[in-house]
Amino acid sequence: MVFNSKKLKQGLLSLGHKVSEVMIHDHIEADTDSIRQDNTSKSSNTRKQRVNSMRTFVNRSFKKSTRTHAGTDTPMKPAEAPKPTSQSTQPTQPAKSTKSAQQPATLYRRVNLFRTFAHIFATKKDSSSQSSLQQAQESVFKQYIGWRSVTNPLWCLYGMRVSVIVLSIFGLFMVFSSSSVTMITYGVAPWGQGISQTLYCILGMMGYIFASRVPVAYYRRYVAIIYTVSAVAQFLTFVPGLRREVNGNAGWIAFGPITLQPAEITKLALCIWLPIGLLAAKRAYERVRMRAYIPVAVGLGISLLLVIAGKDLGTALIIILIALIAFYLGGFPTRWLITGMIVASIMVALLVLTSQNRMRRILATLHGCDAKAAKGVCFQAIHAQYAMASGGLLGVGIGNSREKWNYLPYAHNDFIFAIIGEEMGFLVASAVILLYIIIGWCILASALQTESKFISITLMCIATWIVGQGLVNIMVVVQLLPVMGVPMPFVSAGGSSLVMCLVAVGVADGLMRANPRLTAAK
């Protein structure tokens, strides 16, 4: 918006004159009342003489002020004093008028100060503020031109939003396509899973909008409640009657027809709780040394043990990855961080060695599948490769997959990327990977530009969760990693994963909009 500086200047000067005129008028009226009360015994001629002397003094003062501004602006016409009556022509008594003239003189100095401020503001402030704002906007614009535009906080915000929306909508179509045969097999309508996924997507979008509007201070205030809710929900997986086991994974709870996977809540809770706890421990490190990190270590250990006890090693690995990023960025001592990584590696190795199924999966990934394993532990991985190979460059067409006809188990869950490659081809599958990279880059760029350590670490944890889990799922499908049972964010069927992933990026959205550079880039 372009302002007319001349009109603004005249308007401010006129406003100053009006305000000063009202102030003087009120002052004269107040003085008139005091004269009327204090001098009730005096004649009316004396009172009128004092009032008229005050009006004359103010009138002369405004004429002097008008002559002062005549060189720069149009002279301002002060209010005309009332014509003196026949009684006002009498000479005034100096002794009586001195006290009355002191108050208008002081008032005139105050009014003149206001008029001077208005004049300076009209002539200088309007142009300087506009020029400084334009310079700031131009500097911000020049900062993000060319290849630097990929770090523009505004572009990153909308890039993340568009990528999440595209993945979520694309996931609805793929869930419907990949689950239709399975639904018919179980005697359910072919669109049953698709409708359920749509409802979860709407619920997740509502959670996204709500989370994006939460002020940053609320996370610090209610972080203990967030962590407690996640820990209690994870503990409910061991309560008889609520516990639900799916394919050996006991990390589910059921409330009637609704099932919930609390581990998804735990991921989001740790993304918020770990940065706050680590930053608080770092501030107390100088006083109590490593004892400051005991509460954080205990809280992380409780959540991790509850997930591992539910036999969900894939989710436990994602949590370990999130914790590793949080501890590294939170300033945890490097020596102890390396020690913790060694301990975590030993624990994972023990969990693998004590499970024959996990050990066979790892060996099949490293050494290939023999004829016996092809019908057992390698069955999913082999048919996933069949699906990817038959898709080619452009795919066989949406809905025309062959592997979804009960050849590839859980085609709409953990192996939905194989159906994407088969039906949509290599190009669309590559575009899906690109969308995850865009989400990760946008969150990473915003995390590096913010001045808040809490926001930076939280954004990095969320990016590690979303992008890391997505890449792990893809690497499992192409047999670069053993089967872990990790869903694909925003795409795989599953209400808990979809809702919590959308809420997580909603939290990231709100934290990204807290960046002051985002306002400057608009």
Model regions: which residues?
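Hydrophobic alpha-helical transmembrane segments
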Residues: 199-204, 272, 422-443
